[in-house]
Structures are given as C-alpha cells and as structure tokens.
Regions:
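A metal-dependent hydrolase signature that marks the N-terminal structural subdomain at the beginning
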Residues: 1-48, 67-68
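Stable alpha-helical elements in mature extracytoplasmic
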Residues: 4-7, 74, 78, 82, ...
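Active-site scaffold of zinc-dependent metalloenzymes
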Residues: 35-79, 89
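Short active-site segment of divalent metal-dependent hydrolases/proteases
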Residues: 83-91
C-alpha cells in the first residue's frame, strides 16, 4: 500500500469505514480546470467516484505528519472531506447538505466548533454557498 493509500485508509478508519463501504476513491495530483484550486477533493456527478487531490494542503499536511494512523486535526479534516464528497454521491449537488454532513462529521470526530479546522470548513461553506447563489457550478468540491 502506498503512503497516499495509507492516508486514505487512515481517514476511512476515523470514519469507521473501509474502502468496501465507500464510493470508489481515486487519487489525483491536481484539480481539473473546472474545480476550485482550493479544493481537497471533488466529485463529477453522475460519476460515483470521489477524487482526492494529493497536492492539496490538507492531503500534503496529512502525508507530512504521518508517523502512524493518527487522529490529528488534519486527518480529521480529510475524513470530513470524504464524508462531504460521499454525501454528494448519495444525495446530489446540494452544497448546503454536503457541508452540514462535513461539519457534523467533524463534531463526531471530536473537533469543536471553536477549532480552526471547524471554522475553516464553515468559512468555505459560506463562500461556496454565496458563490452558488451568483453562479451554479458543475463540479462539486469540498475544502
């Protein structure tokens, strides 16, 4: 198993999940042109795959801090990103629902609302929802 695959396995473990119980996860180096450059992962519906961006700060931080499968804030954020993208695959394009699933996952993993990781996801949600009101996107991405 590659180091990148081990990071995904660790994030899934935090969720109490395995590769068998999640939509397929594909690692990509960079987001496509139609996705946000700040995205950690994305889906392109109706394709049922979660694409995790290995050049994202969240993934790079998880790789750098990995001595063993940890419950670091970065790993919890990555796990919540997977929950966000899975929500899209199961429920569709609604960003509000996906972000609420992500925030709920962070809470379940022990990340409190006053934590920087939780707040950064809230800020991303607000920015994405504001942008969507102005112009709908075709690609869904979690940060």
């Amino acid at each position: 198993m590659s180091s990148a695959a081990a990071i995904i396995a660790c994030a899934l473990s935090l969720l109490g999940r395995s590769e068998r119980t999640m939509p397929p996860i594909t690692l990509v180096e960079a987001p496509p042109k139609h996705a946000s450059i700040q995205a950690d992962a994305f889906v392109s519906l109706p394709d049922p795959h979660i694409y995790v961006i290995t050049s994202s700060p969240t993934f790079r931080d998880a790789m750098a801090s990995r001595s063993s499968c940890s419950e670091s804030a970065t790993m919890k954020k990555l796990a919540s990103v997977l929950a966000h993208e899975e929500w899209h695959i199961r429920n569709g394009a609604d960003e509000s629902g996906a972000y609420y699933a992500q925030l709920t996952t962070l809470l379940r993993l022990g990340v409190p609302p006053d934590n920087n990781v939780y707040r950064s996801v809230q800020r991303s949600m607000q920015a994405v929802l504001k942008k969507r009101k102005q112009k709908p996107d075709l690609v869904l991405a979690g940060r």
